[in-house]
């Protein structure tokens, strides 16, 4: 493995391997778990045992034939013959030869046992008494439900006290706690167990069900088998279990914020997954499943509905229906529901593109130009195409690439443009191939495009780092505009109405496309905004990154 790692840097030129594949391979081979498995494999290979012979009993009998005549001559021979003829020693040799030759007879069939069906009522002597030790306020990591007037364990949270001890299982019935019957109220039992400290004695009626360990029930996120790999998701909404009226146990919930990375450890319940924080660690907690949260967010109240909230019903709800039209692409995006996004952890690497998103006039172009001027060896950008005629002082390929309108229309129809538009009767646009040309030179291509283009860019082909340049408050924006006008940097005067449009447009873009953004920078000072962006880009080269799973598999 070490030799492979040392030669990885030479592979791209010699084999034509994709850079992202090599980064992923390096990340796997440098993983401590993989290294430990490799060491264990080597040790097992080195110490592999093989039987010297599988006919030792036959060999001993031949020895006995040779030395038996010498019994009367030598006492040691007599003692050895006695040992070799010992029934236990003969049986040991016979067992060794059977194992060495791997010749096993089927065991005799045992008489059929009358085992009662597990579905029948369990006998009284099946009741078990368990003892645990806990601190006051420490959660056990279980939730309960009422079943046939009994309190039954509904789920065991991954990494919790009960999960670590392995004494209880889903379906077990709780009969008593410290000698007192528990009744049939799950909330009362949760409070009782939460407040108890010291030794706790539980009387349970086991379920005798086949239990599945949390490691066997990782999420199957559609394309990949659940048990093969760990599953991580990026959250696109804030969640506080104490504000959720649907969660079966608020104390068992896991609070998280938008943008956090969670590890999903169990998805057996269609409505409530078990997850844990990747950054903070700790035991797992309940979070709403993709299905449940989509269901909650997909329904809107009718305009005429004033009947108040209903629990567990959607009779007074309606779905908003909309046909997808390319002319209403932005409107369709506004209603896109984003809950969780599956991600994978990658070693540090340079992104292929840096995409700056924001409202018109927030400073995206100024930031882009500053990066390219200060470090042209690392950053580049595209040259836009246009159908207008070049002016006298313009050269093809500098500010614009000039093509005929018919050629440009044909390429637009063929999907060769990332974005395009028309101004004063002329077409303008950014070609997809021009982005790849910059990337192929080893530089990061900086783009300031419309947010709708993110659907095309957010793939493994472009690997974008998406930064939203947010507009500051109206007062700050007004002061910034006055400063650039007074300094003679611009002669274009903007009214308060223009500035307010910028602020409103910035807020609209953030609401609709927030789930695409890797970083948000409020541009209330161009120098500070540049420093923040520069720091973030440098971190990409030094720290591991969480990227969409589709970039890896």
UniProtKB/Swiss-Prot annotation:
The keyword DNA-binding does not apply. The modification Phosphotyrosine is found at residue 513. Transmembrane segments: none annotated. It is found in: Membrane. Pfam families: Guanylate_kin, L27, PDZ, SH3_2. It is a peripheral membrane protein. The keyword Phosphoprotein applies. Keywords: Membrane, Phosphoprotein, Repeat, SH3 domain. Residues 1-48, 49-107 form the L27 domain. Residues 228-297 form the SH3 domain. PANTHER family: MEMBRANE-ASSOCIATED GUANYLATE KINASE MAGUK. This is Protein PALS2. It comes from Mus musculus. The gene is Pals2.
């Amino acid at each position: 493995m070490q030799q492979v790692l040392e030669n990885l840097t030479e592979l791209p030129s010699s084999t034509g391997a994709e850079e992202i594949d090599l980064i992923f391979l390096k990340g796997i081979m440098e993983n401590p778990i993989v290294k430990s498995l490799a060491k264990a494999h080597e040790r097992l290979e080195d110490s592999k045992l093989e039987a010297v012979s599988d006919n030792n009993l036959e060999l001993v009998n031949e020895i006995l034939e040779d030395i038996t005549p010498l019994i009367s001559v030598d006492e040691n021979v007599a003692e050895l013959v006695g040992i070799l003829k010992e029934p236990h020693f003969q049986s040991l040799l016979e067992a060794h030869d059977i194992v060495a030759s791997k010749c096993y007879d089927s065991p005799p069939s045992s008489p059929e046992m009358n085992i009662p069906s597990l579905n029948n009522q369990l006998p009284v002597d099946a009741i078990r008494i368990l003892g645990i030790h806990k601190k006051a306020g420490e959660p056990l990591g279980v939730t309960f439900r009422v079943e046939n007037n009994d309190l039954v364990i509904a789920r065991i949270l991954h990494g919790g006290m009960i999960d670590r001890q392995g004494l209880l299982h889903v379906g077990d019935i709780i009969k008593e706690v410290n000698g007192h019957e528990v009744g049939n109220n799950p909330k009362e039992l949760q409070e009782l167990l939460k407040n108890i400290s010291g030794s706790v004695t539980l009387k349970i009626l086991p379920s005798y069900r086949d239990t599945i360990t949390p490691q066997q029930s990782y999420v199957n996120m559609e394309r990949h088998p659940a048990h093969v790999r760990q599953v991580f998701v990026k959250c696109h909404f804030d969640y506080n279990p104490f504000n959720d009226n649907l969660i079966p146990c608020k104390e068992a919930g896991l609070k998280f914020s938008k943008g956090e990375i969670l590890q999903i450890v169990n998805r057996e319940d269609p409505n409530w997954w078990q997850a844990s924080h990747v950054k903070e660690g700790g035991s797992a907690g309940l979070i709403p499943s993709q299905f449940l949260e989509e269901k909650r967010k997909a329904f809107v109240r009718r305009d005429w509905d004033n009947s108040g909230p209903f629990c567990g019903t959607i009779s007074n709800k309606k779905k908003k229906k909309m046909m997808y039209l390319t002319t209403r692409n932005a409107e369709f995006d506004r209603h896109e529901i984003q809950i969780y996004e599956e991600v994978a952890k990658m070693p540090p690497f340079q992104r292929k593109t840096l995409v700056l998103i924001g409202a018109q006039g927030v400073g995206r172009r100024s930031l882009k130009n500053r990066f390219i001027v200060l470090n042209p060896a690392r950053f580049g950008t595209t040259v836009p195409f246009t159908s207008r005629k070049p002016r006298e002082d313009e050269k093809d390929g500098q500010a614009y690439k000039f093509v005929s309108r018919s050629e440009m229309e044909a390429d637009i129809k063929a999907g060769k443009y990332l974005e395009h538009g028309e101004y004063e009767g002329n077409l303008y646009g950014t070609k997809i191939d021009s982005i790849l040309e910059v990337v192929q030179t080893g530089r990061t291509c900086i783009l300031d495009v419309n947010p709708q283009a993110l659907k095309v860019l957010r793939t493994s082909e472009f690997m974008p780092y998406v930064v939203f340049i947010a507009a500051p408050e109206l007062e700050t924006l007004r002061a910034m505009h006055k400063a650039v006008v007074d300094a003679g940097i611009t002669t274009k005067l903007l009214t308060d109405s223009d500035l307010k449009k910028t602020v409103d447009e910035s807020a609209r873009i953030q609401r609709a496309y927030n789930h695409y953004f890797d970083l948000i920078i409020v541009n209330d000072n161009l120098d500070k905004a540049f420093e923040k962006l520069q720091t973030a880009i440098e971190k990409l080269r030094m720290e591991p990154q969480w990227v969409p799973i589709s970039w890896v598999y």
